Amino acid sequence: MNFDVVIIGGGLAGLTCGIALQKQGKQCAIINNGQAAIDFSSGSMDLLSCLPSGQKVHVFCEAFSELSQQAPEHPYCLLGQHQVVAKVQQFEQFMQELGLVGSHKQNHLRVTPLGGLRHTWLSPKSVPVIAENEHFPYRQIAILGIEGYHDFQPQILVDNLKQNAAFSHCDFSIGYLNIPELDYLRQNAREFRSVNIAQLLEHKLAFEDLVQEIKQAAGNAQAVFLLACFGLDDQRFFDSLKQATALALFELPTLPPSLIGIRQYRTLRDQFEKLGGLLLNGDRAVRAEFDGDRVARIFTTLHQEESINAAHFVLASGSFFSNGLVAEFERVKEPIFDLDIIGNKAFINSERVSWTDKRFAAAQPYQSAGVAINHHCQVYKNGHLIPNLYAIGNVIGGFWGIEQGCASGVSVVTALTVAEWVGGTK
């Protein structure tokens, strides 16, 4: 099989890169094994929420110079501020298809399921968000759970929201939806999850009864916070509820798998395939062959004898969570190409004792491990550049995606950087 570009990994980074390349006329294939991390995400995307020093970031561009001083190995710093901002703006134009709101010019705050407020870059329009130093626009808020669903506790949410200045003016009420169609799922707690709820409601729901139940439980509330379990493939079902109830409905992400993240994944996947891209689902890249210093072909679990050939290869396999990186006893390793590994200043790959911090709650050095790249996201093997192999997303080293709140930003910025470079390379 021959392609212009083969992408290993079908998460946010891989699909974003694939879509951008397909739009440029490249023929791409994505090798995808299992669920991507986006399926487990809140649906909000972070650009940079926190500097390595712990300082909160409000305006990305204002924090960039400080980031460069504190973490020169960060992918943003390798690419440069001009390139990062250009790709961020490019993604913000594309984000409308995902139903996201926000801007790199100012981080906003999103409400978490436990009632906290987190700085973020982009959020689904259905999620409650607040601008910095502003109050939530509604005073009367109803928090509605679902009877028998134990992974969401409205009282905890309310108690924590009351401690935030943005909600200090609000009056809260708590209620529970019965939804008789869910009685079958209530018999087995293991099946009573957001995805199962959404699947069942999509096919066996008395819609008008649900509308009336929400309106009755909401009482005099101006805004209603619901679990994100209404609408499996997109937000049309939730938007219909919002219109029918004539209430300001908002949804909060649940414990993984996250319905909001799954919607985003399916939107990206569908667009990639509509543009003519090929998804090789349930397959895993296992080894590669080189012609000189270039990758010539790869082999997968399902194609052990038949090679997959391309002019360019993109590694978007993620970090430890998705086996894009593996930790052997003596080193952290990238398992397909055995590429060079870097991390933050404290991480030394050959010294296992440097992988962890003695404080359990601290950012662990091993979490910053990943492959080394240059400013075009090309990778290195034994110190030598591989000109037609690129890395994007969380497989890259030199940053803490969770602690610094930049995992999604690194994914889309590096993905679009590679798409631009490969698209202009003959």
From Swiss-Prot:
Pathway: Polyol metabolism; glycerol degradation via glycerol kinase pathway; glycerone phosphate from sn-glycerol 3-phosphate (anaerobic route): step 1/1. It catalyses: a quinone + sn-glycerol 3-phosphate = dihydroxyacetone phosphate + a quinol. It holds the Pfam family FAD_binding_2. InterPro entries: FAD-dep_OxRdtase_2_FAD-bd, FAD-oxidoreductase_2, FAD/NAD-bd_sf, G3P_DH_GlpB_su. Keywords: Flavoprotein, FMN, Oxidoreductase. Conversion of glycerol 3-phosphate to dihydroxyacetone. Uses fumarate or nitrate as electron acceptor. This is Anaerobic glycerol-3-phosphate dehydrogenase subunit B.
